[in-house]
Amino acid sequence: MNPLIFSTILATIIMGTVIVMTSSHWLTIWIGFEMNMLAIIPMLMKQHNPRSTEAATKYFLTQATASMLLMLAVIINLTHTGQWTITKSFNPLASIIMTIALTMKLGLSPFHFWVPEVAQGIPLSSCLILLTWQKLAPLSILYMISPTINLNLLLSMSLISIAIGGWGGLNQTQLRKIMAYSSIAHMGWMTAVLAYNPTMTMLNLLVYITMTTTMFMLLIKSASTTTLSLAIMWNKIPLVTTLTLTIMLSLGGLPPLTGFLPKWMIIQELTKNNNIILPTLMAIMALLSLYFYMRLTYATTLTMFPTTNDLKIKWQFEPKKHMNLLSPLIVTSTLTLPLAPTMLLLD
């Protein structure tokens, strides 16, 4: 892609998200969503093949539907309250439709079907943007309207998302689909605590973005897109493979890695609000995600027959300048659990 075009598209994506996050007028928020959606479609189609075109089309149709639902909710709320701005008074029907629209944009169940399909059809770099940056705008609006959200609807969708995120990844061999299902599960954890403690949702989002960015940078570095390529990579660059699998375990929430921190704090927060059944079910469902990450790690490291370096490899490992941030990201993604007592004190 031409550098000028790429820079323009990237600036528009960033601008659209910033407009959504800083606006209090619903029309401006809708414009920001549309700018963001239209700008990212060329990023999804960088490879110019039928699969990426199909992925971009699915993304466009889903996001356009969500935007229409969002405007429908805004119009219903306008007829009842006469307000174009985000206020604490929100019509119940409009609140339900707004929640559905925003969760569709996020990829929560039962509106999650587009996430794995789109992620599988696009390059790793575009998939990174889709699963990290594109979550900021919808989550920021959910954060703003959290006092008016229908709690039962949001908690139900959160629990189903955690379950689907675990079940969906069980039989996957494609790493992009595994990351997509991981994203669905993490979004479920974030939205579960949103109505109780929105700040904790933002902390979870920060940890998720850090871990996912690290994971994708390692996959981009090694050009790995399948579990088989990870197994082959073990023979060529074992250090990078070890780090990749460690980040996977952190994404699954295995103590004492960083990924356990937000899950621990969310379960504690929900329990503090006399909600016992939900965090229990969430913890059980989280074991599904942890299981397929551990199975992948086991299959890659302990069941591969030892081979020599004469094996025909698809790539040659070449360090790149833009990977300078990888070391601090890896440390942050795996070793920040000791900061938990400080965070609990601040809370």
UniProtKB/Swiss-Prot annotation:
Domain of life the protein comes from: Eukaryota
Entry EC no(s): 7.1.1.2
Catalytic activity: a ubiquinone + NADH + 5 H(+)(in) = a ubiquinol + NAD(+) + 4 H(+)(out)
Enzyme class: translocase
Keyword hit for Cytoplasm: no
UniProt KW NAD keyword: yes
Record field: transmembrane: 1-21, 25-45, 59-79, 96-116, 127-147, 149-169, 178-198, 200-220, 237-257, 276-296, 325-345
Classification via Pfam families: NADH_dehy_S2_C (PF06444), Proton_antipo_M (PF00361)
Coiled-coil annotated residue ranges, if any: none
Molecular functions per Gene Ontology: NADH dehydrogenase (ubiquinone) activity
Matches recorded under InterPro entries: Complex_I_Subunit_2, NADH_DH_su2_C, NADH_UbQ_OxRdtase_chain2, ND/Mrp_TM
Subcellular location: Mitochondrion inner membrane
GO terms for biological process, alphabetical: mitochondrial electron transport, NADH to ubiquinone; mitochondrial respiratory chain complex I assembly
UniProtKB keywords: Electron transport, Membrane, Mitochondrion, Mitochondrion inner membrane, NAD, Respiratory chain, Translocase, Transmembrane, Transmembrane helix, Transport, Ubiquinone
Membrane topology (UniProt): Multi-pass membrane protein
Any one GO cellular component localisation term in the record: mitochondrial inner membrane
Family: Belongs to the complex I subunit 2 family.
Summary of subunit composition and partner proteins: Core subunit of respiratory chain NADH dehydrogenase (Complex I) which is composed of 45 different subunits. Interacts with TMEM242.
Protein role: Core subunit of the mitochondrial membrane respiratory chain NADH dehydrogenase (Complex I) which catalyzes electron transfer from NADH through the respiratory chain, using ubiquinone as an electron acceptor. Essential for the catalytic activity and assembly of complex I.
Protein name: NADH-ubiquinone oxidoreductase chain 2
Organism field: Natalus tumidirostris
